[in-house]
Amino acid sequence: MKLGIIPYQEGTDIVYKNALQGQQEGKRPNLPQMEATHQIKSSVQGTSYEFVRTEDIPLNRRHFVYRPCSANPFFTILGYGCTEYPFDHSGMSVMDRSEGLSISRDGNDLVSVPDQYGWRTARSDVCIKEGMTYWEVEVIRGGNKKFADGVNNKENADDSVDEVQSGIYEKMHKQVNDTPHLRFGVCRREASLEAPVGFDVYGYGIRDISLESIHEGKLNCVLENGSPLKEGDKIGFLLSLPSIHTQIKQAKEFTKRRIFALNSHMDTMNEPWREDAENGPSRKKLKQETTNKEFQRALLEDIEYNDVVRDQIAIRYKNQLFFEATDYVKTTKPEYYSSDKRERQDYYQLEDSYLAIFQNGKYLGKAFENLKPLLPPFSELQYNEKFYLGYWQHGEARDESNDKNTTSAKKKKQQQKKKKGLILRNKYVNNNKLGYYPTISCFNGGTARIISEEDKLEYLDQIRSAYCVDGNSKVNTLDTLYKEQIAEDIVWDIIDELEQIALQQ
């Protein structure tokens, strides 16, 4: 096993060294310890649900992500491979959620928060990268039936001054804040889990009280013929994203424009009149800014669009095995801009992408269109830029001279002349987790169930008959993508092991 990899513990780790060939049974790690938080009783179904909170496991926060892993003695160098908790199907992630949000004791499809809790959010364990995907969310506790009835009655009456003065709107506002609520939608890795989905630019959400669309914290009424949700309602989501090939083509074009803008900015900084004007500390600062821009250009030129880079390490936390990796962070606008406005507008949209909404099988419309792209360089990992910039400046030089007859002094001079910085690690990489995640946010006792299995999706056949009009169209379910995701993890585990073996030779 590679030096630095944590050793196995035969009594607790999942190791099959002594198992006979053909008798090795796959086993997933046990669920972590659970602490009971509260109970919810559905007024529609009359069923009580018990909710728990996990103990002694790390949650995804502070730009670090975790997932369970298992010992694999067939991986002689890496030693460990990806695994999942023993759930029967996809659902809400155990680790990719706010600490204040609870999950059902009996499965991973129900999420809730206790009464008097503010907004808490959880993401699904399925990453949607391309194509059309459909899922449903059932309201267990949320919405506001009284408010919905009040709105319907209000539509049949005229707004009078007396009604406004009587404080009807203030009463409605208080009623909204004192009742359970939900928000649903999709978000990216960068979205905060301590705020409702749609709070920032990385999420797209729907309100349960009015079915308003929320993005960047702004409300929009784009859905038609919808009514406020009540318990028992099922909201259908159809997310359509362009193919990975189309997204890569867009990312490449955007990278070219950013490199061109960087070069133009650097040419302006290096003009002779500016060097003469800048002296002393200002000249040193100018040189440092130029070096930083050169490093940014090197990172952009180093992007591998078709590769997956998973910089994850196995750790043992309270006698449990996890993979730890850095997560994607919120990106800031570059310090440079070209005169082409498309750098900031057209290339920040996924063409023909949308999120369509259905209420109990009834089509309400497209809540969002032209979603934000996510492949590098639109997304970037947490990155110690100062450290990697220093390595790029002072790292070992690449020996690009193939002339064996060259004298050592001349060869050394050529080597210094052709010296190039080494990029130890790039922040513009795809770790196979870039995509949009189905998301649920709960408030003040709000409770919802995500439905991902094909046989439990009540309106799936209706959706497929409407959207699969030709042989090229296909509507996936979350459970199907979940199984494909597991298969991809196995493949990339093997590829990572083979790459490490090749590096050792």
Curated annotation (Swiss-Prot):
GO biological process, one term: subtelomeric heterochromatin formation
Primary location class: nucleus
Region (Disordered): 271-290, 398-420
Phosphoserine PTM sites in chain numbering: 227
CDD domains: SPRY_Ash2
Listed Basic residues bias regions: 409-420
Residues of the signal peptide: none
Domain B30.2/SPRY: 70-295
Any single Gene Ontology cellular-component annotation: nucleus
Keywords: Chromosome, Nucleus, Phosphoprotein, Telomere
Binding site for DNA: 318
Outcome of gene disruption: Leads to hypersensitivity to brefeldin A.
Gene3D superfamilies to which the protein is assigned, alphabetical: 2.60.120.920
A single GO molecular function term of this UniProt record: transcription cis-regulatory region binding
Top-rank lineage group of the source organism: Eukaryota
Keyword Phosphoprotein: yes
Classification via SMART domains: SPRY (SM00449)
Subunit structure: Component of the Set1C/COMPASS complex which consists of SET1(2), BRE2(2), SPP1(2), SDC1(1), SHG1(1), SWD1(1), SWD2(1), and SWD3(1). Interacts directly with SDC1.
Family the entry assigns: Belongs to the cclA family.
Additional observations: Present with 1310 molecules/cell in log phase SD medium.
Protein name per its UniProtKB record: COMPASS component BRE2
Gene assigned in the entry: BRE2
